[in-house]
Amino acid sequence: MKITNLLMDIDEYLKGILWQILDSYKILAELDDTTNGLDIIKKQTSKINGLLQVINNKLNEKRYQSDHLVTLRKLSKYYITTYDYSREIEYVLEIYSDDPNRIKNLRILIINSLNDRRMIEKIQNILDEI
């Protein structure tokens, strides 16, 4: 009974975080490629990275061994260690902030990275499960 309550609590906690990640992804996917869009890209990627770090830290404990929690931990750890666009975003902000093609390419690169290992799809599936 205690383990079931623990899993229900962590699932509710993660549900809010996962919805925030999906909301940020949707914002990035629908964004205009303007200078204002670049500021939004910076904010949303920072938010996603922070939320994935929270998931990774929270699920790093051995007591969370259900399939969807292990999947989330692996996905978040992979993304955090593989992708960091902060330098590229700052570079585009400083030099190419008026170039919609560079902004679009950066945005598409970030969206593609979020779809690496089907992360967004798996997050949606996990939300359907819990």
Model-predicted segments: where are they?
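Long, low-complexity or tandemly repetitive, helically biased scaffold regions used
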Residues: 1-130
